[in-house]
Amino acid sequence: MDSKKLALLCRELADNKKAEDIVILDVRKLSSVTDYFVVATGTSEPHLRAIVTEVTEQLKADHHLRPNAVEGDMGGAWVVLDFFDVIVHVMRGDVREKYGLEELWSDAPRVKPRRARASAAAE
């Protein structure tokens, strides 16, 4: 699976658990470490855990993909899933605001999802 498809799939899986304000940043021209960041907000520790579990378990079950590394505490405020070409950041809103990844990587184009939950519900 190419890195853009993986980023979109990670976004979709996070959306399945109602992650908020999900953004995909295309950092291919800005970083030699990864191609895409997926940034999502969870509203509580259990919500963060549910999002992280959905992404890791579904990628493992459906695509035999496991993160190279998992950083942060599942019961904490920020968890990072490193899939090499895609890095998924799941964080509480206050932590996301404090560190401002989108501002830090403001030169990175945003990738539009195939379908958002709101548009899918409207159909």
Identify the meaning behind each predicted range:
Residues 1-24, 28-29, 43-53, 69-73, ...:
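Long, contiguous binding/interaction regions
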